[in-house]
């Protein structure tokens, strides 16, 4: 689930200050608008932050244009986005809080082992939000919901990096 799996972090939103049902629905509905754009999402992250691409051994040092249309890239992007979709589907329901927390905590631990820094988590957040703004129905309410979810999620994931 390499670095792109941090997208899953974007949807937890139920840790320190739970997302409201409306916020969770905004995150879910906006994600539904892009969840089938796996390759484009991963390519956007890599284009914005080549240091993130460098953390993926199978893609490190390669020209993004030369790998974007490969089966390996599509397979990896799909695996990651599917993980995010699972986490997003769990968000907004208090009964799922422990499952989401466990997934995000494990994600942080796994990424610590890969040498991912808090700064790279921040880069990913920036790239993700930029992608979402350009590809979904985006307004102040959607931005607030994603920021709330990201703030909560990063609190858990970054703690795992310590």
UniProtKB/Swiss-Prot annotation:
One of its GO terms (cellular component) is extracellular region. The keyword Signal applies. Keywords: Heme, Iron, Metal-binding, Oxygen transport, Signal, Transport. GO terms for molecular function: heme binding; metal ion binding; oxygen binding; oxygen carrier activity. It comes from the Eukaryota. Residues 1-16 form the signal peptide. Residues 18-162 form the Globin domain. Heme b binds at residues 76, 111. The keyword Transport applies. Homodimer. There are at least 12 different components in Midge globin. There are at least nine genes for VIIB variants. Belongs to the globin family. This is Globin CTT-VIIB-7. It comes from Chironomus thummi piger (Midge). The gene is CTT-7B7.
